[in-house]
């Protein structure tokens, strides 16, 4: 694999640790109805069972893969060139775009310390009075290549996978979701047309591999990255991007608030195979030197267009923080904890005016539909502690977000709705129920929720508990929380730990909903565990490297990977080994009994 970078680093940005194929996995591509629809998947080949366990072949397992070309040994990675623009031909074929006239240029007065991306593409926008959104195409009955790509990706060779299940597949409870329906391109189109799913694919981010967010599909996770005024750099954030998607992030959000926001975002977009989201108000605030009072609709509009031209796929907009709702937060224990929400609340107070994102919402929609940028309607009044959960401010904003959802749909703009936050377990389901009712089943996208406030340093765990629950109830995408939540900017290890916690939560939710293929991986790993196929256990796990490392801490020899025990129980007390001995003895006794019957008098 060839890796080059124009970033000013003493060593290569992307180490073998970041780009090597996952342990025991092979990148494969499934071709669709046309040769340029090549859907990446991860195949795990399994070893045969030993003679004691029947000596049967164990068929390989195909898994959803988000890592792009970075884990493909045949790919050449050049960060200065970016990823292949796989969707360019599809966009051009629709003949509904033109070159954008407005293109961001760094003002001479702005000090830029980061290297600009060497070859930024010419941005596109829709032709006049045309919407270029996947929602518009879906409502017209058009099945796009993006929709077919998604259908193949979500289906995961489901028929083969389910057929290979040895154990009983438990019935799930999907709370009204259509889990189990075959994922066809037409099903994808229909879900998008109904607003129950979004396919976030800005026409200026052709490098992205199409994916879908909706409760009738696999539960997705998002990872937040981004520079701050005090820490991190472009190089670190690009590395975090590649690291995050390696472990399973379905989308990433660039929440940069430090210098060089535009350059950071360009490097990330050009090298991201997953959708990229942002919160434009952060950059808008940087443009007015951090003075909230100086913010305006004009500054925000120009910032949004700038980001849309770069290729941002979805944006968080805190348009539901209305002036009348601010007093509802006065009695809260922790006030307004959303950065965007607090900014807009402060602006409303300073100007004694309504939130300009709310009053200009239809103009926002006109911009979004010209690039196919999806709304992620921000929950600026989400609870920031358990004490504030499910209060009047939170649900007043949710009702407004529901109204804005329908306005966006009327403009053919894709929408998902953000949710909390900090919520104790007994109050979680009410959040899902209220969102479905208020927002017409638009996808729900939640931060956790954290189920307790007492564990700084472990909030990836406190929040994964809530994430698993709300994912089961129907949340379409879960925003990860890292161990650094409330404490600092996450590093690579924090990103890894947050993603693994949320992959567990998302998979647990899919199991509980009864997703047809979800249990296949569990069953394959359980079978490997019972048969002491250690390498297969490692390869099937969410983090093969850690599983192997923990095993080898106490039993490092190669022979130990063929042993019928681990260091927990040893060779004499392994329950699974004893269980197989019980089976063998029972089988022998049954065989002897049958022999006795067959040889007795009169038979």
Swiss-Prot record:
Give the highest taxon in the source lineage: Bacteria
**HAMAP family on file:** ThiC (MF_00089)
Q: Which organism is it from?
A: Xylella fastidiosa (strain Temecula1 / ATCC 700964)
Function statement: Catalyzes the synthesis of the hydroxymethylpyrimidine phosphate (HMP-P) moiety of thiamine from aminoimidazole ribotide (AIR) in a radical S-adenosyl-L-methionine (SAM)-dependent reaction.
What does the record note on quaternary structure? Homodimer.
InterPro entries for this protein: ThiC, ThiC-associated_dom, ThiC/Bza_core_dom, ThiC/BzaA/B
Which cofactor(s) does the record list?
[4Fe-4S] cluster
Where [4Fe-4S] cluster is bound, by residue?
A: 566, 569, 574
The catalysed reaction is: 5-amino-1-(5-phospho-beta-D-ribosyl)imidazole + S-adenosyl-L-methionine = 4-amino-2-methyl-5-(phosphooxymethyl)pyrimidine + CO + 5'-deoxyadenosine + formate + L-methionine + 3 H(+)
What's this protein's family per the entry?
Belongs to the ThiC family.
Give the cofactor note.
Binds 1 [4Fe-4S] cluster per subunit. The cluster is coordinated with 3 cysteines and an exchangeable S-adenosyl-L-methionine.
User: Which NCBIfam families does the record cross-reference, listed alphabetically?
Assistant: PRK09284.1 (NF006763), PRK13352.1 (NF009895), thiC (TIGR00190)
Residue positions binding substrate:
224, 253, 282, 318, 338-340, 379-382, 418, 445
Q: Provide the top EC class.
A: lyase
Q: What is the lineage of its organism?
A: Bacteria, Pseudomonadati, Pseudomonadota, Gammaproteobacteria, Lysobacterales
Q: Which GO BP terms sit in this record?
A: thiamine biosynthetic process; thiamine diphosphate biosynthetic process
Stated name of the protein: Phosphomethylpyrimidine synthase
GO CC terms: cytosol
Q: Which UniProt keywords apply?
A: 4Fe-4S, Iron, Iron-sulfur, Lyase, Metal-binding, S-adenosyl-L-methionine, Thiamine biosynthesis, Zinc
Binding sites annotated in the UniProt record for Zn(2+): 422, 486
